[in-house]
Amino acid sequence: MQIYLANPRGFCAGVDRAIAIVNEALARFEPPIYVRHEVVHNKFVVSDLANRGAVFVEELHEVPDGSIVIFSAHGVSKAVEDEAERRDLTVFDATCPLVTKVHIEVAKFAREKMDAVLIGHQGHPEVEGTMGRFSAQYGGEIHLVENEADVEKLEVSDPDRLAFVTQTTLSMDDTAVVIDALRKKFPNIQGPRKDDICYATQNRQDAVKDLAQRCEVVLVVGSPNSSNSNRLRELAERMNCKAYLIDNAGEMKKEWFAGVGAVGVTAGASAPEILIQEVLNQLQQWGGDLPDELKGIEENVTFSLPKELRIPVKEVGL
């Protein structure tokens, strides 16, 4: 059985930065360090950080006054940010800079008294944070749509003063369909100057398409609550591959590969390489060949840590 390995795969710059922020905070300051929401959507990563003193909470009321809290890579609403300031919490913001870019766009549209449309999945923390960056005090409104049916039902106050943004981890193909529907219904709708789908999401989706053309089965290493990992699985399935989303090698079943000539392995943007290697090892134990790593786009994007975590502790004033 041939094994093909997607490239790029796994950690993106935003995830690297978010995990580094938690690690640096734990190294500089004594636990507990509170983290609002899972810093990234991966069970292995979250469990490892929790074992070293990170305390994961869903809401700020679970964080004692005066504590250190880290916002997850998915971003938070303005209301959450304001609450942290009121309660004298020391905040290290691990929001991915590409998500922050969308926050800035939404806030700008609000100030310009426009309505905004967010293409995204209801209930996802990134969507909640972005929706919460739109201030209705200027008279506009933000609307959430997931698909063409939502666009068909959408009503806005002024179709000529309308703009859209997207969640960063969506399927490019699905998003293009929704954008086309928006432009058809609202010909004067404005879009972002640059596509909101992040570079890592796009690169990993391109890589899984390459993988699916060569394989009968595709394994996506990632947690069930990872949006970008789910999109990779769906994309492989659309290309007539059997595709499985797995947290780790222990979730694989040998019967998945009975009679299979080629299997592909990729990983979502929040899955660490160690989990990918464990999957490859298990496949080889079941008779797979040495993995063939496919060529792909080389990623050299990096994001710096907050300045408070780059200077000596005594200068931070904590």
Curated annotation (Swiss-Prot):
UniProt-listed Enzyme Commission number(s): 1.17.7.4
UniProt-annotated binding residues for [4Fe-4S] cluster: 12, 96, 198
Free-text remark on how the cofactor is bound: Binds 1 [4Fe-4S] cluster per subunit.
Reaction equations catalysed: isopentenyl diphosphate + 2 oxidized [2Fe-2S]-[ferredoxin] + H2O = (2E)-4-hydroxy-3-methylbut-2-enyl diphosphate + 2 reduced [2Fe-2S]-[ferredoxin] + 2 H(+); dimethylallyl diphosphate + 2 oxidized [2Fe-2S]-[ferredoxin] + H2O = (2E)-4-hydroxy-3-methylbut-2-enyl diphosphate + 2 reduced [2Fe-2S]-[ferredoxin] + 2 H(+)
UniProt keyword annotations, A-Z: 4Fe-4S, Iron, Iron-sulfur, Isoprene biosynthesis, Metal-binding, Oxidoreductase
Pathway connected to this protein: Isoprenoid biosynthesis; dimethylallyl diphosphate biosynthesis; dimethylallyl diphosphate from (2E)-4-hydroxy-3-methylbutenyl diphosphate: step 1/1; Isoprenoid biosynthesis; isopentenyl diphosphate biosynthesis via DXP pathway; isopentenyl diphosphate from 1-deoxy-D-xylulose 5-phosphate: step 6/6
Biological-process GO terms, alphabetical: dimethylallyl diphosphate biosynthetic process; isopentenyl diphosphate biosynthetic process, methylerythritol 4-phosphate pathway; terpenoid biosynthetic process
Cofactor(s) needed for function: [4Fe-4S] cluster
Family from the record: Belongs to the IspH family.
Residues involved in (2E)-4-hydroxy-3-methylbut-2-enyl diphosphate binding: 41, 74, 124, 168, 226-228, 270
Matching HAMAP family: IspH (MF_00191)
The protein's enzyme class: oxidoreductase
Active site: 126 (proton donor)
Gene Ontology molecular functions: 4 iron, 4 sulfur cluster binding; 4-hydroxy-3-methylbut-2-enyl diphosphate reductase activity; metal ion binding
Classification via Gene3D superfamilies: 3.40.50.11270, 4-hydroxy-3-methylbut-2-enyl diphosphate reductase, catalytic domain
UniProt-annotated binding residues for dimethylallyl diphosphate: 41, 74, 124, 226-228, 270
Function description: Catalyzes the conversion of 1-hydroxy-2-methyl-2-(E)-butenyl 4-diphosphate (HMBPP) into a mixture of isopentenyl diphosphate (IPP) and dimethylallyl diphosphate (DMAPP). Acts in the terminal step of the DOXP/MEP pathway for isoprenoid precursor biosynthesis.
Binding site for isopentenyl diphosphate: 41, 74, 124, 226-228, 270
Name of protein: 4-hydroxy-3-methylbut-2-enyl diphosphate reductase
